[in-house]
Amino acid sequence: VTQGEDGMELSLFSRDVIALATAVGLSHNVFDAALFLGVCDKIVPGLFIGALQFGHLPAVFVPAGPMTSGLSNDDKAKVRQQYAQGLVSREVLLEAEQAAYHSAGTCTFYGTANSNQMLMEIMGLHLPGSSFVNPGTPLREALTVDAVKRAVALSQNKATGIGYQINAKVIVNGIVGLLATGGSTNHTLHIVAMA
């Protein structure tokens, strides 16, 4: 819906605002560990950059998992084309968008949001196997509870902050994972800032 609008030019700026807001939140110095909830496009890189400003804190990123399939990408594209041609109203366009993105979770295709989830798991910041479990399922709930338990356990050990965990090898592993899985090319911009 926002493709081609002026606000799209602010994508990297908004990532940096997310990083700053994360760092401001952590700056109150009252945390033993932190859970990071965010999956979409520039949110995860922003959270990651902000978390590293407080590298002494253990960090666990909690994925949402991909939403279940809604309106297919082909059907959604058809409605978008019809809207661009003036054949359907804005209301029809918005109904199609809502049917395609109808629930909690990441988009149903392997774009930036799902690449973020995979990247965080490869870098050791998600619980293993948690990236692609659908929201609203008993397993997703159990993984979220276990992520909290993991953050508490990490807070008991002084050398488990995200700054101790992230190094050049971890970044390279993330890049290899992105390349091996056909991950989002948006990370060619984000991974440099994250490193």
Predicted feature descriptions by range:
Residues 183-195:
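Alpha-helical support elements that line or immediately flank enzyme active sites
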Residues 1-13, 186-189:
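Anionic-ligand anchoring segments at beta-strand to alpha-helix junctions in alpha/beta enzyme folds, i.e.
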Residues 11-166, 170-173, 177:
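Active-site cavity-forming subdomains of large catalytic enzyme subunits
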